[in-house]
Amino acid sequence: MSNQYQEEGCSERPECKSKSPTLLSSYCIDSILGRRSPCKMRLLGAAQSLPAPLTSRADPEKAVQGSPKSSSAPFEAELHLPPKLRRLYGPGGGRLLQGAAAAAAAAAAAAAAAATATAGPRGEAPPPPPPTARPGERPDGAGAAAAAAAAAAAAWDTLKISQAPQVSISRSKSYRENGAPFVPPPPALDELGGPGGVTHPEERLGVAGGPGSAPAAGGGTGTEDDEEELLEDEEDEDEEEELLEDDEEELLEDDARALLKEPRRCPVAATGAVAAAAAAAVATEGGELSPKEELLLHPEDAEGKDGEDSVCLSAGSDSEEGLLKRKQRRYRTTFTSYQLEELERAFQKTHYPDVFTREELAMRLDLTEARVQVWFQNRRAKWRKREKAGAQTHPPGLPFPGPLSATHPLSPYLDASPFPPHHPALDSAWTAAAAAAAAAFPSLPPPPGSASLPPSGAPLGLSTFLGAAVFRHPAFISPAFGRLFSTMAPLTSASTAAALLRQPTPAVEGAVASGALADPATAAADRRASSIAALRLKAKEHAAQLTQLNILPGTSTGKEVC
């Protein structure tokens, strides 16, 4: 800031001298930009009341208004302008006013739209036009340059750092990651004097406009020493922009496609400059796409969409880091046999475990609670599917309707096969005895006071076998059935139970008749005294009898039960 403007601002607000010179006190900015602004005074037709330094500055400014952005010596006539005011009021700086400025704005906007629609990936974008929007009006995305310029033309009193559009790519991080010899420039102050969190308007225009845009203002070849000192950082940035054109184009297109591809899942709303940059990058894209760009453009073709882990790049994020996040996906969980056994055991207890049960299972099985929950959801769906399929394909002749025929413990021993396989649920001797008694029951006269079975051909429910009092209470058990239970009680082998079940009816009647005179007390004593070895011997004898008689499935007692 030159001394004459500091004196001019401090004459009205004397307390501004106590402020830090590097932070550009808000009082000085208010007096320079707000009250003594040549723009506002010329807009009001009060140019005759300008002080001498500002009036002397107005004529060179009018002379330089129409000059292009990349002219060789844009600031030769107004070397007294400090760099901050030069950014604001110089050519391409975003504060050109009236007359030629408005015409240049319309022409440049039309040129920007045409070039954006027709240019190739390396097409030259037009110089950014001056703002034609009213103060505070947001750009509508007609072009990246117009968007950034209009954002820079916010109202004097309401211009804040938070209103400036975010830069679409973090320049220093992306250059550093791409291996470019990048020396970060000193943090430039923005219009309000804050440390350079948001770059000045020329840099915003250069970044948003893409690599094909013209060099930013101040990149001229002026030979004056003071001009080179004032614009040294801007020239460095322009040279880097030309050298790293390919990297910046690739990163801009990556970020633009990420913003356009996933607008719904993006938590950060794209600002005007970023949206315009995205539109320009996609519109100017021509020819073949590299494999990396095709992967970015159609990520679902390569990896499938995963709603949990899809990541949207925000406007200020680093594009390479976001690309790595987008490539991650959750693979299918592979369960070990032990984990599956434990999960199945828990599923047998309850189909809907609570959160504590799920967490306990997860800790015990070294899984996450979410994986356990998803497993139970899938298992319930599979169970419902099997249940529905079993109910639809159930033949009418089976004793148990629907899925009960597949899940009931006694179902393998009630079908037509002569020697059914071992069923793990048949580990209770009482259940085996009840099955044998039910198999022998139709061939014997029912004992007095006992419940009668349904007629032949009617399906037998679970309560018929296990819930009827005839199999539970000793008072309803005749001596013949007591003897049968005494021989069946200690059985643990399914083959023995199957052999007794498939035994022909005369053999069962003979076995029952041999103990017909025994009372229930004697039956209980025999049940306690009998040994497993004797029962195994009897089972072998029964198997031998079955082999000798050559029993066919049609004459088995399983058919008689039905």
UniProtKB/Swiss-Prot annotation:
Localization in the cell: Nucleus
Location (main, coarse): nucleus
SMART domains referenced in this protein's UniProt entry, alphabetically: HOX (SM00389)
Sequence ranges of Acidic residues compositional bias: 223-253
Summary of the tissues where the protein is detected: Expressed predominantly in fetal and adult brain and skeletal muscle. Expression is specific to the telencephalon and ventral thalamus. There is an absence of expression in the cerebellum throughout development and also in adult.
InterPro entries from the UniProt entry: HD, Homeobox_CS, Homeodomain-like_sf, OAR_dom, Paired_Homeobox_TFs
GO molecular-function term, one example from the UniProt record: chromatin binding
Single GO BP term: globus pallidus development
UniProt entry tagged with the keyword Transcription: yes
Protein's UniProt name: Homeobox protein ARX
Species annotation: Homo sapiens
